[in-house]
């Protein structure tokens, strides 16, 4: 009885109770308290693409440093192929073997060098990405202030999330916080137009994919400007959200909610270089592939800035939260999503309480009838 009392009375217990008896109740699950249930599928294969992209950038830097002329790159599933103009350049590039032999099989073919990621390393990369998704989601849920969430792996590439006790008003916010990729990038704007067809025609291409060969990217815009629904930016983001030291709710000069951000050491240096080299140009603030704002750079900025948009106060708070927690390293799909009401749990608790009372009374009566005086003594001892 003493151990069960905190479960039924909770905050109604007197202050002295915890000093004498256990004050922690039984943790009630989703079926009893209601809340949020999500089953996420992690696109772990994207982690392999990201790893190949990182290898590509590293190789490019090493070859440029050694003044090796490179014709181009080709991506094939889990392989990266380097094409050279001459045999001498290929021979110079072979020294890369020692840097990547532990993670990739390296093959030579005419004027090409191919790096094929080893299966063992692919598994390691994917596992690391799934674990990082799990920890990022845990950080987001914990920072939201939810008590006792359950976040765990479910099979090879799935994550199960249960948030018991979430109020009806918080459930939608929690789901959005969990699902959001929160990939923040800063890119220089090259052009803008009310529709993408105008931009594609202007740059002589038929699809956004063809812009990549020109070092450009097409993004939709959510800036509130009707004549700027689509933007073309530089493909490479020299600064991303990984360099943020803080993100917080602020208000702009018109009193509208916004998100203020600050950079740490290397991020401040990178952001300062990006803005300093592009004074007079527009800087796109890209969130999950959508441009939220694109202000003109008036002067060099190094340490902090602001993301504006059509945010409510809660939306700005939630965006700041996910930016502080970090972006998901790979996309996730929601396979199952349920919000469970507490009514079923309330009925179960009431039935459990009633059955415990009825059962307890039945035991007391049985012991008195069967054991007489000894039964009375035993009942008193149990009560104490």
What are these regions (language model features)?
Residues 260, 264-279, 283-284, 350-384:
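Interfacial segments of transmembrane alpha-helices in multi-pass membrane proteins
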Residues 287, 301-336:
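Extended, hydrophilic extramembrane loops/domains of integral membrane proteins
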Residues 1-37, 62, 215:
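Hydrophobic alpha-helical transmembrane signal-anchor segments
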Residues 26, 34-44, 155-157:
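Membrane-interface junction motifs in transport/secretion proteins
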Residues 1, 38, 137, 165, ...:
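Residue-level signature of catalytic and energy-coupling elements of molecular machines
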């Amino acid at each position: 009885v003493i151990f069960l009392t905190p479960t039924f009375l909770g905050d109604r217990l007197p202050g002295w109770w915890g000093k004498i008896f256990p004050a922690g109740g039984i943790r009630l699950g989703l079926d009893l308290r209601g809340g949020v249930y999500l089953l996420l599928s992690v696109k772990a294969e994207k982690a392999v693409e990201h790893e190949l992209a990182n290898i590509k950038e590293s190789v490019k830097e090493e070859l440029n440093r050694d003044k090796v002329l490179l014709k181009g790159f080709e991506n094939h599933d889990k392989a990266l192929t380097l094409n050279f103009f001459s045999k001498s350049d290929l021979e110079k590039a072979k020294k890369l073997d020692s840097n990547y032999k532990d993670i990739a099989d390296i093959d030579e073919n005419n004027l090409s060098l191919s790096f094929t990621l080893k299966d063992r390393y692919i598994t390691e990369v994917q596992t690391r990405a799934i674990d990082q998704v799990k920890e990022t989601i845990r950080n987001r849920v914990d920072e939201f202030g939810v008590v006792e969430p359950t976040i765990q792996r479910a099979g090879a590439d799935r994550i199960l999330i249960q948030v018991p006790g979430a109020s009806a008003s918080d459930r939608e916010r929690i789901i959005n916080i969990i699902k959001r990729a929160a990939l923040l990038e800063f890119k220089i704007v090259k052009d803008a137009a009310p529709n993408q067809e105008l931009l594609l025609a202007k740059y002589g291409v038929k699809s956004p994919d063809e812009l990549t060969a020109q070092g450009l990217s097409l993004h939709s815009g959510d800036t509130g400007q009707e004549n700027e629904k689509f933007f073309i930016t530089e493909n490479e983001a020299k600064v991303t959200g990984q360099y943020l030291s803080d993100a917080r709710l602020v208000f702009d000069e018109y009193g509208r909610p916004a998100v203020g951000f600050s950079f740490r050491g290397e991020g401040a240096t990178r952001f300062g270089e990006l803005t300093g080299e592009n004074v007079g140009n527009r800087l796109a603030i890209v969130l999950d592939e959508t441009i939220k704002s694109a202000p003109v750079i008036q002067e060099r900025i190094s340490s902090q800035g602001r993301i504006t948009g059509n945010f409510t106060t809660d939306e700005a708070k939630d965006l700041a939260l996910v930016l502080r927690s970090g972006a998901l390293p790979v996309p996730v799909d929601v396979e199952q999503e349920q919000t469970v009401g507490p009514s079923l749990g309330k009925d179960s608790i009431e039935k459990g309480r009633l059955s415990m009372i009825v059962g307890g009374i039945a035991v007391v009566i049985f012991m008195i009838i069967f054991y007489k005086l000894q039964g009375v003594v035993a009942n008193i001892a149990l009560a104490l």
